[in-house]
Amino acid sequence: MQIDLNADLGEGCGNDEALLALISSANIACGWHAGDAATMLQTVKWALANKVSIGAHPSFPDRENFGRTEMQRDPEAVYADVLYQIGALDAMVRAQGGELAHVKPHGALYNMAVRDAKLCEAIVRAVRDYDSDLVFFGLANSQMIDIARAAGLRVKEEVFADRGYNPDGTLVKRGTPGALHEDEDVALNQTLSMVRDKQVRAIDGTWVPIRAETVCLHGDGAHALAFARRIRERLGAEGIAIRAGN
């Protein structure tokens, strides 16, 4: 058995270089919610040095709120936003002799795509039109996966190590009780359950079937590095290899 470990990087959190030694896929901010050209380039160099699969992490144009504020934008504007950001990061990757592998929307753009089909279709169309060989990362069991597959893209169903789940398989909204698992042991056990047993316990105690192909580790917490090391060790002890597998 194998699993991909991904993290959102290039967001100015200071752990990037060390985290890249522990993960298999990096989602690099494209400057619209965090980072800038210099940060993007440096993160790309670190990722290539660690042989980590590189992906674009496009967002709404929302640096003030780290891309976590929902915006009502026309689908064509979102299409242009995403296309622009993918192209910017791809330029950095190509200049260093690498190859862009995937795209994962960020923050509110990701969460809205779970429930807004037209928004999701615009994101997926931008990915497909830029490069139909790119892999699309989306929330496991959600319409993001269905829409991307219908467009002919390869997908990876994403689960979250430290986020709470609703009974319908969506993530508990940030800022509400149960949204984040502060206890590392809870997050570790949840990850193992999703990867090995293909199920997750929702906040109401019910078990929800889930397909895990890539696990997101948040890189902006105070204990991000320690948790990444623990999760690698725990998965390794279960005989689960860490690989991007694109």
Curated annotation (Swiss-Prot):
EC number: 3.5.2.9
Main EC class the enzyme belongs to: hydrolase
Reactions it catalyzes: 5-oxo-L-proline + ATP + 2 H2O = L-glutamate + ADP + phosphate + H(+)
GO BP terms in the entry: carbohydrate metabolic process
Gene3D superfamilies registered for this protein in UniProt: Glycoside hydrolase/deacetylase
SUPFAM superfamilies xrefs: Glycoside hydrolase/deacetylase
CDD domains recorded: LamB_YcsF_YbgL_like
Pfam families with a match to the protein in the record: LamB_YcsF (PF03746)
MF terms (GO), sorted A to Z: 5-oxoprolinase (ATP-hydrolyzing) activity; ATP binding
Keyword Nucleotide-binding in annotation: yes
Keyword Hydrolase: yes
Domain of life: Bacteria
Keywords: ATP-binding, Hydrolase, Nucleotide-binding
Function, in words: Catalyzes the cleavage of 5-oxoproline to form L-glutamate coupled to the hydrolysis of ATP to ADP and inorganic phosphate.
Subunit details: Forms a complex composed of PxpA, PxpB and PxpC.
Entry's family note: Belongs to the LamB/PxpA family.
Protein name, as recorded: 5-oxoprolinase subunit A
Organism (species): Cupriavidus metallidurans (strain ATCC 43123 / DSM 2839 / NBRC 102507 / CH34)
Gene: pxpA
